[in-house]
């Protein structure tokens, strides 16, 4: 049945619903390969490689050619603008390469977070001015979904009501609506940074508050929820919290409770960001989330960047002779997160120190 909105035809709604459901196919998740040029500078410098366009292309090619098993675990890939238009060594566009593997191409459409006037250290996301034209072109060039990241911080004064309203409106009234009108499934990402001294309970409460503002805005602007996905943080304590560290089960329960209180059942799926957790913690916590009993009407899976790529990048080290070994590492991380997305991960006895290393970056930006 079509929605009450007159902004989309039934055919448009059907296409959006189909794409969203395909992305959250059971046992599959998203590879977030949408790091900006600046973020890639940090990644490549960590292995002693210069941050050139060619090195960025070679690294993304390594990821996207990991082998026939990649599409068993990965349903979609989010790309940065540069990556979206790059090609393999033999001239095949990355978008075509992914489509041939049955993997859905996606695109990061925000242009980063900038300071928000009238707030204490909070930010808003830029990129709305030409978004309609860019979405139309990306759809024409093969994209089927998009991502827009907004950021909240937890402190004694934040998030402010000003930021809550601005970010919700940013995500709902313009970004999501524009994407849907151009045939792109909008992934809504209201990230709450893990920075801070807050306990798990405060992290849960702030997550619930953020979600309530976001979905109020989405509904107010007639966004077709069945054709959207949510990319939230998991509920954790702050990185500087000095109390007892919450268990995986604690994190799972707090996260699911926040979702139950704030995310409509019409939303097909929740694709979690890893938020600077170690690769292994991101997998264990995703598994714990899926093992929580009770009502969970959405698919609960992953949209990981660093938590899928960190060990892979280290193994590659910029050397051609390491490509195959690095791809094996990527496939392994994808496989264990596939298991976690259906609550069947039992731990990784082979996990090395790299997989357990925290990937937290203070005030992280993409």
From Swiss-Prot:
Pathway: Carbohydrate degradation; glycolysis; D-glyceraldehyde 3-phosphate and glycerone phosphate from D-glucose: step 4/4
Active site, UniProt feature: 189 (proton acceptor), 231 (schiff-base intermediate with dihydroxyacetone-p)
Catalytic activity: beta-D-fructose 1,6-bisphosphate = D-glyceraldehyde 3-phosphate + dihydroxyacetone phosphate
GO BP terms, alphabetized: fructose 1,6-bisphosphate metabolic process; glycolytic process
Binding residues annotated for substrate, in chain numbering: 56, 147
SUPFAM superfamilies noted in UniProt: Aldolase
Record InterPro entries: Aldolase_I_AS, Aldolase_TIM, FBA_I
Its EC number(s): 4.1.2.13
Expression across tissues: Ubiquitous.
Keyword Oxidoreductase in annotation: no
GO CC terms in record: cytoplasm; cytosol; endoplasmic reticulum; heterochromatin; sarcomere; striated muscle dense body
Statement: the UniProt record of this protein carries the keyword Lyase: yes
Class of enzymatic activity (EC top level): lyase
Record-linked CDD domains: FBP_aldolase_I_a
Necessary for preference for fructose 1,6-bisphosphate over fructose 1-phosphate, annotated site positions: 366
One MF term in the entry's GO annotations: fructose-bisphosphate aldolase activity
Database matches in Gene3D superfamilies: Aldolase class I
Alphabetical list of PANTHER family matching this protein: FRUCTOSE-BISPHOSPHATE ALDOLASE
Protein purpose: May be involved in the metabolism of fructose-bisphosphate (beta-D-fructose 1,6-bisphosphate) and of fructose 1-phosphate.
Recorded family membership: Belongs to the class I fructose-bisphosphate aldolase family.
Protein name as catalogued: Fructose-bisphosphate aldolase 1
Organism field: Caenorhabditis elegans
């Amino acid at each position: 049945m079509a929605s009450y909105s007159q902004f989309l035809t039934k055919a448009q709604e059907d296409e959006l619903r189909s794409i969203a459901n395909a992305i959250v196919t059971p046992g599959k998740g998203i590879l977030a390969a949408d790091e900006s040029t600046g973020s890639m500078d940090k990644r490549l410098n960590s292995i002693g490689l210069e941050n050139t366009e060619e090195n960025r292309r070679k690294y993304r090619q390594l990821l996207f050619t990991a082998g026939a098993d990649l599409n068993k675990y990965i349903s979609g890939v989010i790309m940065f603008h540069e990556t979206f238009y790059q090609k393999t060594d033999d001239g095949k566009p990355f978008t075509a390469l992914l489509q041939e593997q049955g993997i859905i191409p996606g695109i990061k459409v925000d242009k980063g977070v900038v300071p928000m006037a009238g707030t204490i250290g909070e930010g808003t996301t830029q990129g709305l001015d030409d978004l309609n034209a860019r979405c139309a072109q990306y759809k024409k060039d093969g994209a089927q979904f998009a991502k827009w990241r907004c950021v909240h911080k937890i402190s004694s004064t934040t998030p402010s009501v000003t930021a809550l309203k601005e970010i919700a409106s940013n995500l709902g009234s313009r970004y999501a609506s524009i994407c849907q009108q151009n045939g792109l499934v909008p992934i809504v990402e209201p990230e709450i940074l893990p920075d801070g001294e807050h306990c798990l309970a405060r992290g849960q409460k702030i997550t619930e508050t953020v979600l309530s503002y976001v979905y109020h805005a989405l509904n107010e602007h007639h966004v077709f929820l069945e054709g959207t996905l949510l990319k939230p943080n998991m509920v954790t304590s702050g990185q500087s919290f000095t109390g007892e560290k919450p268990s995986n089960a604690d994190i799972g329960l707090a996260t699911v409770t926040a979702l139950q209180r704030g995310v409509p059942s019409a939303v097909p799926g929740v694709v979690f960001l890893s938020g600077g957790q170690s690769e292994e913690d991101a997998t264990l916590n995703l598994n714990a989330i899926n093992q929580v009993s009770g009502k969970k009407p959405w698919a609960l899976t992953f949209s990981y960047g660093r938590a899928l790529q960190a060990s892979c990048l280290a193994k590659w080290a910029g050397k051609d002779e390491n490509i195959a070994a690095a791809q094996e590492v990527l496939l392994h991380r994808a496989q264990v997160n596939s298991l976690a997305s259906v609550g069947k991960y039992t731990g990784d006895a082979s996990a090395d120190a790299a997989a357990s290393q925290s990937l937290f970056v203070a005030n992280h930006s993409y």
